[in-house]
């Protein structure tokens, strides 16, 4: 989290927000029933170590919910090098199996995988589709000129974004 974001949450929502590394937070010996990590696992250079540290922060029956994309999804395989989540600041890519193994090796049992559709403006969707499917650029250019379409929100479900639900296994 940014300092600005942490302060905003503290001041406006009266939340206990910690803006520090996991290593520093572990020293406080605080345990949690639930930890949520939304769209962050792919940014860690050593996600295996992060899961080990998260395990230490969970109570005995603690839960971990994390969201990330499944690199083995049909959509990711179909788009290949044009897959829109292959970007420089994503350091690691996961499959369902990889996360299951990482979890088990860190006393976290993968209990459930849920599809995680997102919503976006039609204008943004057209921009992205133009990058992924450049041969259809003529069609996307026509659609992008229809102003009222740009701000319509659409549900996008490519079956590649997932919510992973883990439960801590006794130490």
Residue ranges and their predicted role:
Residues 79-87, 126-133:
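Short glycine/proline- and charge-enriched loop/turn segments
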Residues 41, 90, 115-116:
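Short N-terminal micro-motifs specific to bacterial/archaeal maturation
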Residues 1-78, 93-106, 161-168:
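Conserved SAM-binding loop
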Residues 112-171:
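A C-terminal cap/extension of S-adenosyl-L-methionine-dependent methyltransferases
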Residues 17, 110-113:
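Generic structural signal for residues in well-ordered beta-strands
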Residues 83-97:
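Acceptor-substrate binding/catalytic loop of class I
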Residues 7, 56, 83, 154-155:
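Short secondary-structure boundary/capping segments
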């Amino acid at each position: 989290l940014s300092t600005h974001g942490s302060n905003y949450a503290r001041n406006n929502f009266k939340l206990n927000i910690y803006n520090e590394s996991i290593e520093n937070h572990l020293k406080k010996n605080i345990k949690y029933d639930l930890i949520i990590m939304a769209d962050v696992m792919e940014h860690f250079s050593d996600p295996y170590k992060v899961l080990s540290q998260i395990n230490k922060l969970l109570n005995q029956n603690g839960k971990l919910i994390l969201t990330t994309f499944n690199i083995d999804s049909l959509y990711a395989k179909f788009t290949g090098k044009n897959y829109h989540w292959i970007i420089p600041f994503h350091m690691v890519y996961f499959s369902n199996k990889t996360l299951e193994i990482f979890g088990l090796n860190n006393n976290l049992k993968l209990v459930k995988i849920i599809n995680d559709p997102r919503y976006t403006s039609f204008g943004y969707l057209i921009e992205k589709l133009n990058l992924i499917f450049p041969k259809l650029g003529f069609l996307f250019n026509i659609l992008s000129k229809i102003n009222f379409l740009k701000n319509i929100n659409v549900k996008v479900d490519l079956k590649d974004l997932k919510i992973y639900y883990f439960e801590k296994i006794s130490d």
